[in-house]
């Protein structure tokens, strides 16, 4: 997948998250976790995914998750600088920050759907 495809699908997932206020918190977390897994390889997207996770944790008044997201935001630059990014890690405080993970099926499905939704035929330019 190209960086442009990754960015488009990442943006789609965040849009889905912002549009999902009527869904249960667990379902909304899945959207943020999918954005983290997808965006983890690009510093800007990785940073944004943790910022959104922090924001969501603050809205839920989840102190443990807030603390974990602050720690992860501190680790993101070093992880990229040292190329120590645990592939597939969902980015939540419920899993160790350095643990590589197999992608959970629900997250894999969300990423696949985001990629399908944002795919353009070759040669077609993005809409302005």
Regions found by a protein language model. Name each.
Residues 1-40, 60-128:
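N-terminal alpha-helical interaction modules that lie
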Residues 13, 31, 46, 50-53:
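TPR repeat positional signature
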Residues 54, 58-60:
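Internal catalytic or translocation cores that form aromatic/hydrophobic pockets or channels
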């Amino acid at each position: 997948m190209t960086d442009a495809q990754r960015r488009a699908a990442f943006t789609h997932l965040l849009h889905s998250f912002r549009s999902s206020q009527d869904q249960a918190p667990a379902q909304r977390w899945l959207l943020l976790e999918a954005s983290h897994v997808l965006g983890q390889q690009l510093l800007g997207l990785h940073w944004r995914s943790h910022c959104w996770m922090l924001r969501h944790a603050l809205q839920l008044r989840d102190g443990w998750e807030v603390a974990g997201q602050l720690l992860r935001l501190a680790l993101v630059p070093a992880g990229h600088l040292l190329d120590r990014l645990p592939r597939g890690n969902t980015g939540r405080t419920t899993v160790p920050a350095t643990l590589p993970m197999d992608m959970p099926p629900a997250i894999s499905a969300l990423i696949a759907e985001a990629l399908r939704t944002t795919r353009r035929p070759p040669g077609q330019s993005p809409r302005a």
